[in-house]
């Protein structure tokens, strides 16, 4: 059975992607901050879902990913779907720093961990979901434009 891990699977696009993969018969690892939402997903497909509470802003998030990989017996696809975006008309630094902690530091932390896992395994796929605001820019939320940090990783290959 193929295995996908989705970080940010408790709502939105991440949740819908998890449902699609479950429907296609994959083993799905779901992760996010809200334990009660993770449990609902697990109960919706007994035996097909593994859960792990992961907050990508925490330094121990890669260790939590390792725990989820172990529970699942491996990982074939990694999808990062966690992200936040808030209107910030006053350009309050705290709002931008919170966004950067999730969307930039969280990206670096989690994609790095997945990449090194796949490097050891010799294969695997990494996908990242972002916002259109990242490509167009949004004056009231400048940190959303930081998705471009992922561009250089698109062409990395594990041989």
PLM region spans:
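Conserved glycine-rich Rossmann-like NAD(P)H-binding loop of the short-chain dehydrogenase/reductase
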Residues: 24-39
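Rossmann-fold cofactor-recognition segment
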Residues: 45-60
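Residue(s) in the substrate-gating loop at a strand-loop-helix junction
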Residues: 131
């Amino acid at each position: 059975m193929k295995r996908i891990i989705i970080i940010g699977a408790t709502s939105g696009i991440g949740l819908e992607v998890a449902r699609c993969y479950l429907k296609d018969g994959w083993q799905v690892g779901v992760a996010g901050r809200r334990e009660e939402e993770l449990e609902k997903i697990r109960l919706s497909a007994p035996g097909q879902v593994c859960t792990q509470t992961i907050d990508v802003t925490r330094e121990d998030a890669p260790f939590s990913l390792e725990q989820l990989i172990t529970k699942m017996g491996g990982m074939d696809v990694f999808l990062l779907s966690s992200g936040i975006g808030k209107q910030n008309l006053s350009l309050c630094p705290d709002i931008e720093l919170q966004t950067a902690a999730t969307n930039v530091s969280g990206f670096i932390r989690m994609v790095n961990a997945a990449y090194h896992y796949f490097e050891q395994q010799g294969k695997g796929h990494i996908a990242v979901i972002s916002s259109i605001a990242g490509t167009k820019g949004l004056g009231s939320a400048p940190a959303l434009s930081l998705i471009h940090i992922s561009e250089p990783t698109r062409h990395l290959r594990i041989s």
